[in-house]
């Protein structure tokens, strides 16, 4: 039975995700590299801000860091409680998940790669999708903790499978985003009212999350709120393309999309939302999508 839970990494997602845990668990430890943020979380949500060495003595340990390298470096420097389950919500590299799962198993520690989707609004409302790779028994034991932060908690395969699904999901997001930018620029060039076109498409077969929420709320509004940073989308599309190459599959659309997102990231303003990738296409066409 889970007696204590820890959350490591209180970024835009982690801060909101960890807030739900005290509703279900008596002891919830939080740690962040900027420790003032952990103390702020404790004050706001009733968690316990502790040093990293204490956090990794919890029964279930969540991590939500920028990259798999960050997670591996952190794990190498701590002594984790035997019998614990480590749930990594980072959008990470499948091979890294397999390495960590194998290494930690020798210490009687289970590792689940469990990236999430749903952006900050999903983290705030505990409606995230959690895609989980790893041992099924560990998944079942950790399920109550994951259910505190998400709506759909889905086991998708062995170690690395969760990271793989997340990478492909975000690649498909990028494909959708770029194709909608091209399509709507074409419509605007022909004098079509974009709001009217959006109404039609969202009641037709071409609709997607991009047309239903991202384009109207971020692009056409020109707001581009930063909830998922463009560099992170560039990272995830890179992971997805690596999976394609490892499988020796042809994927011309995915390859082209990854190169476009990478280029958009390199030319974007600092701290840009992923949706601002369309600005590079706007610069090419001199058509502003609004």
Identify the residue ranges that each predicted region occupies.
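Hydrophobic residues in well-ordered beta-strands that form the structural core
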Residues: 30, 63, 88, 111-113, ...
